[in-house]
A protein has these predicted regions:
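A short acidic/small-residue loop/turn micro-motif
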Residues: 33-34, 44-49
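Hydrophobic "anchor" residues
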Residues: 36-39
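Mobile-element integrase/transposase regions
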Residues: 1-30, 55-59, 63-64, 69-70
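A short, well-structured alpha-helical segment
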Residues: 48-56
Length: 175
């Protein structure tokens, strides 16, 4: 609590959000860098199985190109996907510190919840409902590219996450 990263890959926040389609529900597993607000790992799935959460984490780890991530903190809620052996072992294998919310309180994982809200507001609620899983995956992938590379954020000085991800030092907030 209260930790403010001064560069990327110091604090990752993770969450899972429900995505409604005309065919039913699917689940978006996200890993976001708290410093840059860049979505560094994600997986859309038709189940809540931990394997999908692990896949999003592996994407984030692979994107760093590093064999160890000592000094990185991974923060999440206490969902079973984040507490399972496979997920915890992957974190510890890369020397990533584990942080979890104390109780179920969305404000304890506010950055992750904000990313969920932005995605839902700008893609899901604003546009036509997803027809099914494939449509959702295609449009979410497109939005994540837009979010990371073209959408300025007031919490990082009106820069885009991919730019902020390359920087260090305090991020100027514009709110």
């Amino acid at each position: 609590k209260g930790f403010v990263p001064d560069e990327s890959n110091k604090l990752w926040v993770s969450d899972i959000t429900y995505i409604d389609t005309l065919d039913g529900c699917c689940y978006l597993h996200l890993v976001t860098d708290a410093y840059s607000r860049k979505i560094v790992g994600w997986c859309l799935s038709e189940t809540l199985h931990a394997a999908h959460t692990v896949k999003a984490l592996k994407m984030a780890i692979d994107a760093t190109g590093k064999g160890t991530l000592e000094g990185l903190i991974h923060h999440s809620d206490r969902g079973v996907q984040y507490c399972c052996d496979e997920y915890v072992n992957l974190l510890t294998d890369y020397h990533i510190k584990i942080s979890m919310t104390e109780n179920y309180n969305p404000t304890d994982n506010a950055i992750a919840e904000r990313v969920n809200g932005t995605l839902k507001t700008e893609v899901i609620y604003r546009e036509q409902r997803f027809t099914g899983f494939d449509d959702a995956e295609r449009r979410i992938a497109s939005f994540i590219d837009f979010y990371n590379d073209k959408r300025p954020h007031s919490s990082i000085g009106m820069k885009v996450p991919s730019q902020a991800h390359q920087e260090s030092g305090e991020q100027r907030k514009c709110w």
